[in-house]
Amino acid sequence: MSYYAFEGLIPVVHPTAFVHPSAVLIGDVIVGAGVYIGPLASLRGDYGRLIVQAGANIQDGCIMHGYCDTDTIVGENGHIGHGAILHGCVIGRDALVGMNSVIMDGAVIGEESIVAAMSFVKAGFHGEKRQLLMGTPARAVRSVSDDELHWKRLNTKEYQDLVGRCHASLHETQPLRQMEENRPRLQGTTDVTPKR
């Protein structure tokens, strides 16, 4: 794992969290219990404090950064999709930020909200609870349905379970030269399926 002290501040990672070895955590970063930090994620706490609360996930290639004297926060059970950028913002409890979305400084995403993939949330945006946000710039298009929130929570549970699975079995290896016969398929831990 790539952890770096910066001006005397050392990242804090709860022992039950999983941080992929290729992720980079610098300086003032606080990672809570059961958090998943994916491959190539960059959490740069060299200006403002970065806080990832319990049960949240920061997926592959995500970037977190912020200005001095501000906290960039992912709330409890927050779900940050592949390639998203969070800069000086607050993601509410149980909210989802879709793949490759950008959330700018001072923006607040409300609890149980969903930001659609590829959305751009402008600086200073203040969302409400349970909004579906989409577009460039993003705007609230409607409320998140019970089914959508259930789907989000199943996906987050998959990542919470992945923490333990990674601690138990993820290790560096060499590739096989060919696929073995009857190669098994990986199974999830919930009945989540892609949203169509």
From Swiss-Prot:
<protein>
    <recommendedName>
        <fullName>Carnitine operon protein CaiE</fullName>
    </recommendedName>
</protein>
<dbReference type="GO" id="GO:0016740">
    <property type="term" value="F:transferase activity"/>
</dbReference>
<dbReference type="Pfam" id="PF00132">
    <property type="entry name" value="Hexapep"/>
</dbReference>
<dbReference type="InterPro" id="IPR023446">
    <property type="entry name" value="CaiE"/>
</dbReference>
<comment type="function">
    <text>Overproduction of CaiE stimulates the activity of CaiB and CaiD.</text>
</comment>
<comment type="pathway">
    <text>Amine and polyamine metabolism; carnitine metabolism.</text>
</comment>
<keyword id="KW-0808">Transferase</keyword>
<dbReference type="GO" id="GO:0009437">
    <property type="term" value="P:carnitine metabolic process"/>
</dbReference>
<dbReference type="InterPro" id="IPR050484">
    <property type="entry name" value="Transf_Hexapept/Carb_Anhydrase"/>
</dbReference>
<dbReference type="InterPro" id="IPR001451">
    <property type="entry name" value="Hexapep"/>
</dbReference>
<feature type="region of interest" description="Disordered">
    <location>
        <begin position="173"/>
        <end position="196"/>
    </location>
</feature>
<dbReference type="InterPro" id="IPR011004">
    <property type="entry name" value="Trimer_LpxA-like_sf"/>
</dbReference>
<feature type="compositionally biased region" description="Polar residues">
    <location>
        <begin position="187"/>
        <end position="196"/>
    </location>
</feature>
<comment type="similarity">
    <text>Belongs to the transferase hexapeptide repeat family.</text>
</comment>
<keyword id="KW-0677">Repeat</keyword>
